[in-house]
Amino acid sequence: MAGGHCGSFPAAAAGSGEIVQLNVGGTRFSTSRQTLMWIPDSFFSSLLSGRISTLRDETGAIFIDRDPAAFAPILNFLRTKELDLRGVSINVLRHEAEFYGITPLVRRLLLCEELERSSCGSVLFHGYLPPPGIPSRKINNTVRSADSRNGLNSTEGEARGNGTQPVLSGTGEETVRLGFPVDPRKVLIVAGHHNWIVAAYAHFAVCYRIKESSGWQQVFTSPYLDWTIERVALNAKVVGGPHGDKDKMVAVASESSIILWSVQDGGSGSEIGVFSLGVPVDALFFIGNQLVATSHTGKVGVWNAVTQHWQVQDVVPITSYDTAGSFLLLGCNNGSIYYIDMQKFPLRMKDNDLLVTELYHDPSNDAITALSVYLTPKTSVSGNWIEIAYGTSSGAVRVIVQHPETVGSGPQLFQTFTVHRSPVTKIMLSEKHLVSVCADNNHVRTWTVTRFRGMISTQPGSTPLASFKILSLEETESHGSYSSGNDIGPFGERDDQQVFIQKVVPITNKLFVRLSSTGKRICEIQAVDCTTISSFTVRECEGSSRMGSRPRRYLFTGHTNGSIQMWDLTTAMDMVNKSEDKDVGGPTEEELLKLLDQCDLSTSRCATPNISPATSVVQHSHLRESNSSLQLQHHDTTHEAATYGSMRPYRESPLLARARRTESFHSYRDFQTINLNRNVERAVPENGNLGPIQAEVKGATGECNISERKSPGVEIKSLRELDSGLEVHKIAEGFSESKKRSSEDENENKIEFRKKGGFEGGGFLGRKKVPYLASSPSTSDGGTDSPGTASPSPTKTTPSPRHKKSDSSGQEYSL
């Protein structure tokens, strides 16, 4: 018994009412009924009035399974209305006071926390863009207008519509696709170019522009789209466009479909067209005036702003890419690095394909999983010095260089580092550093790069600098936009300091900004309105046109309530460079544990060791290790990775809880899942035979990578099909036969590439082309490639980097 707590209150002897014995976490407390019940609607008033069932120990004391150390100052407050912390942190005490419902105490503690936190942010806070209005929905407007504008005939329209996204008919003329439900208010992706940024929401995109005099202004809002956006690209300087050099271009993609708009400075915008890659789009970006889309399956789509021509090219399965000037470099799963000269686009008149040239082949034949190209100051239109760093599926990091004196023999292997035991997922070669990241919880290794007259040197050569981790947990069932909207970096120009952005858990309002070279923490930012950060990016903006002014670097964060917040990283880096404080990296152990209070982690398939229902079954929300989605490690060296359990709101911060009361994502998702199941059930015929739509859905799920997860709606649909007559062994045999046939077709259609030399003399890169790369037929007026000529999917042998999406993640759903 705690002697200082039992019977020590004199009011009990003064007729203040019945004495109540409490057992809080094993420690006995004695107090009066009046002391516990003077605050209405508290935990104690409900407990003593019988509204809450009580559990008593062997002595008859009411047992409360809470922290006794934190309960002591709370009981003292109930007795005296005075607060004595008694060594308990304000944060812990506030959590306990909220549990007990002691409202006066909670208000005092929240006010104490407000002393250090402001709704206007810290000195690094730069601006706030409120959530935009959601545009009105127009039924079938996008597809119809695009077809008429591009002049697609019926065959091409069918090829595009039946590619990978089966549709279900809803009420009236509206058609929607089965897909992963996404909160329509949440900012999925933030991207920027020069003084413009674009925020991608589930069904529309919004462009903002900054001017020194007026600040940030909303310029363009796209029409409402029936499908969910997964990729976005922005070009704020289109040279030679139809409206002069003041044109801007915005593109968004979902699955295989791409839609492109032209935006003028005045805010008016017009749709350029809708294009199809024929396979899921993994990357969407601009190289000059060209819009480029790539897919891991081995397709590259290019649209030129001058010629208005869309072309799709077949290459081998792509595992990485980078850009250098007007060149697109592709790292492929056969160990080769290829490049495409965009200045020679749209096509070579001889055989109607892109100029794809093999640049280098890895000596170990490992897949090229990361690429980084550095153009030295010696490089020019007539120059021929280039440096390329790349990482492989076996964990090797290599640097190859093209010397002026080796023009005819191709790039030479310069350095090799074998410090990673997992596939390399990111690599960056800059002026002063070489940075590589592997799939082991974003393990980072860095080296200093020695240069002589701007070119990499062997004396004394690259030396190890730092080793650290950018721990970042992700949900296994996240939407396809999560990877592009939450990319850790590194961000920044290659001749300047670069940074990583660390988001430890998916549902958090805090980010850590760290130097990419050493891992040193530059700053940590916290949402000013305490809402969850759903996406982020780092861009440099030229806010002033005055002489001597320099671009400033900003961190843009998108939030689940639709707002965008901006943070001044230039000021943060200036402050940290002047500071002499001890270097701090990522979150400390205490900070990490506090962040992990929001979720459960498990190294087994069960979230809890007891027989109670796992929260993963209840909430369908799991966490996994970051960057494990690539799964490019060789089969012989595959290791069992920890599987994180589900998230749950345990000891959730009230600041987060207060903001999340306005976020209805989970209820929205559950509502969509219920309607999804009903629509699929109606679509299955009574006799159990599959109609063409069901067959498409089933085929899409059968061809998907084995590591992908199915959405709950598709799983229920499959079970109903089995119950209505389909036999399990027949399905297994059919899948096995189709997989075998696909493998045979893949071997028959495999493209043989000849190893070519490097750069030819006189040019920046040589003109040695790949002997033959099949070009998908396309029309000069924006036609799409036919699925019948698409290359066989390589995902049977190469896992898709998009595996964290559900099988139906690109398909729309019905309300």
Swiss-Prot record:
Known role: Accessory subunit of potassium/sodium hyperpolarization-activated cyclic nucleotide-gated channel 3 (HCN3) up-regulating its cell-surface expression and current density without affecting its voltage dependence and kinetics.
InterPro entries given in the database record: BTB/POZ_dom (IPR000210), SHKBP1/KCTD3 (IPR047876), SHKBP1_KCTD3_BTB_POZ (IPR047825), SKP1/BTB/POZ_sf (IPR011333), T1-type_BTB (IPR003131), WD40/YVTN_repeat-like_dom_sf (IPR015943), WD40_repeat_dom_sf (IPR036322), WD40_rpt (IPR001680)
Low complexity bias locations: 774-800
GO cellular component terms, semicolon-separated: plasma membrane
WD-type repeats, residues: 174-218, 224-263, 270-305, 310-342, 354-404, 412-449, 457-504, 510-569
Modified residue annotations for Phosphoserine: 604, 664, 711, 793
Any one GO BP annotation for this protein: protein homooligomerization
Family: Belongs to the KCTD3 family.
Highest taxon of the lineage: Eukaryota
Note: Reacts with sera from 5-25 per cent of cancer patients but not with sera from normal donors. Seventy per cent of renal cancer patients have antibodies against one or a panel of these antigens.
Residue stretches of biased makeup (Basic and acidic residues): 736-758
Name of the encoding gene: KCTD3
Biased segments, Polar residues type: 139-168
Annotated compartments: Cell membrane
Residues of the signal peptide: none
Record keyword Cell membrane present: yes
Region described as Disordered: 139-170, 736-815
A Pfam family hit: BTB_2
CDD domains per UniProt: BTB_POZ_SHKBP1
Tissues in which the protein is found: Broadly expressed in normal tissues.
Positions of region (Interaction with HCN3): 512-815
Residues in BTB domain copies: 18-87
Subunit annotation: Interacts with HCN3.
Record key words, sorted: Cell membrane, Membrane, Phosphoprotein, Repeat, WD repeat
Protein name: BTB/POZ domain-containing protein KCTD3
